[in-house]
Structures are given as structure tokens and as C-alpha cells.
Amino acid sequence: MHPRFQTAFAQLADNLQSALAPILADHHFPAMLAAEQVSTLKNATGLDEDALAFALLPLAAACARTDLSHFNVGAIARGVSGNWYFGANMEFLGATMQQTVHAEQSAISHAWLCGEKGLAAVTVNYTPCGHCRQFMNELNSGLDLRIHLPGRAPHTLRDYLPDAFGPKDLEIKTLLMDEQDHGFALTGDTLTQAAITAANKSHMPYSQSPSGVALECKDGRIFTGSYAENAAFNPTLPPLQGALNLLSLNGYDYPDIQRAILAEKGDAALIQWDATAATLKALGCHNIDRVLLG
């Protein structure tokens, strides 16, 4: 078990501990539960889905990287597939506050980058900030997405974001988590192709500026992130954050990164290179390359 889970795990009910122990045994537990595992945990504990999600929130929050705020937020995105995806907030010392990943963004990006096609609900241990409410409004689940908070009845995003502004106001039809493939040819080595594949998945209807990042760890594991734009612009999630989020959720740390590649168009309206390189260098990675899409 990864050390970050030990304190939260010890506070769980005995029957939940027993059912979770074999799942968490892997140091690189991917911070997600397949639908079959969710069913196993429900049967072992007698908890319904909502109660189980609340019980697991401390494990999600244990994934937080909060060197600045020391305020851990955990979220669980429940996919329409039945799979559950953990998320937690991330802060990056030496970078800028704008690079921060919120817990809801973390869980949603986690689900999206794992191939989930839509979300049924998000469970979170603190009320979503305005930034996250706007981020969630980009999803193909729309304002019907259910949000679950401890001690409160479940509500929809519509309740938390009244008079919402979103992609439909800008006549955008393809939404975040809809399947997209921008068709850029795969070239180069495995890591380069992974970055291009991530760029092909980008949700960028406002700038038409696709981008993707691939991070290679010292053990050969590769994590990718795709660019996810938002109708309100500022809640947009850069591709590097998506990749770093997956890396961290899978139990890796920044010193494990040995190489990084950004894929983007050289003449795009928005360029990720400077911000990507600056953040990676702040985290100790200097082996950074850029491949141009075309």
C-alpha cells in the first residue's frame, strides 16, 4: 500500500478495510475502481453507492498534493460505465498558482483520460468552488450531473450553477468527454506518439489549438494529458496538468519523470510550450521536447 493511504485506511470500517486491502496492496494502485470492484465493496459492506462513495472520500483526499495550502480536497467521479475515479487537488511549488488542479478537475480529467464516456455523479468532501462548477458545465452530462456533498441531499449542477453560461451559449456542440479524434498522424518514438495521441483527444472548440503532453517515468511508464478548454476560458485545464494528475494519482512522484514531450501546432492561436516547460523545470524535469503537429 502506498504510504499516503495508511492514515485514511486505518480509519475505515473493518469490513471496508478487509475488502479494500487487496485492491490497495499495489504501490501504484491507479486511484480508480472498476465497476466490478465497486460491486464487491458494496456487497462486503452493505453500503449503497452514495454511502460507499462518501466512505472512500478520505482515500481520494489522501492523493492531494497541497504543499502550499495544506488543505486536502478529495473527489470521486462516478462514470456511466460504473467505474469510479479518484481525484484530489494539486499545487506546484515554484510554479504559478494558475497551474493548480482542483479536486473535481482532477477526478473528471482522470475519468476522461481513462476513456470514460460520461459521468453520472461527482462526490466531493467540500462544496465545489465557482471555478469547478464552471469546469463541470463543459461536460456532456451538462447541468443534470449529480453532485454529492457530506451532510447534504444530492443536488444537480443546475442547482449549484443557476443561470449558467456554458458551451451551448457559444453554439458548441461537441462537449468534454464526447469522443474526439483530430487525426494528426503518429510519428516518432513511443513517447512522441503518446503525446500526439493525447493531442488528438483534445477538447479545444474555442481556440482550435490542440495539444497533448506525454511524461515518461524512469521505470518506463508513460502518462499523458490532453488539453481541455472551457467556455469561460480560465477553468481550462492544460495538458501538462492532466498528465501530472495521472502520474500522481498512480503513486508516482515528480522526480520519477525522466522525459517529457509536448505536442502542439506551431502556428496555433494558443501555445503551451513556455508554461509547460516552466512548470516541468520547477518540478525538476529538464529533458523536455516539443513536436509540432501538422
From Swiss-Prot:
SUPFAM superfamilies: Cytidine deaminase-like (SSF53927)
Binding annotation for Zn(2+): H102, C129, C132
TM segment ranges: none
Entry keyword annotation includes Zinc: yes
Annotated EC: 3.5.4.5
This protein's record includes keyword RNA-binding: no
Name of the top EC class for this enzyme: hydrolase
Domain CMP/dCMP-type deaminase, first and last residues per copy: 48-168, 186-294
Record key words, sorted: Hydrolase, Metal-binding, Zinc
Needed cofactors: Zn(2+)
One Gene Ontology term, aspect cellular component: cytosol
Cofactor note: Binds 1 zinc ion.
Reactions the enzyme catalyzes: cytidine + H2O + H(+) = uridine + NH4(+); 2'-deoxycytidine + H2O + H(+) = 2'-deoxyuridine + NH4(+)
GO biological process: cytidine deamination
One Gene Ontology molecular-function label: identical protein binding
Active site: E104 (proton donor)
Binding site for substrate: N89, M90, E91
Domain of life: Bacteria
UniProt similarity note: Belongs to the cytidine and deoxycytidylate deaminase family.
Entries under PANTHER family matching the protein: CYTIDINE DEAMINASE
Function: This enzyme scavenges exogenous and endogenous cytidine and 2'-deoxycytidine for UMP synthesis.
Entry-linked NCBIfam families: cyt_deam_dimer, PRK09027.1
Assembly with partners or alone: Homodimer.
Protein name: Cytidine deaminase
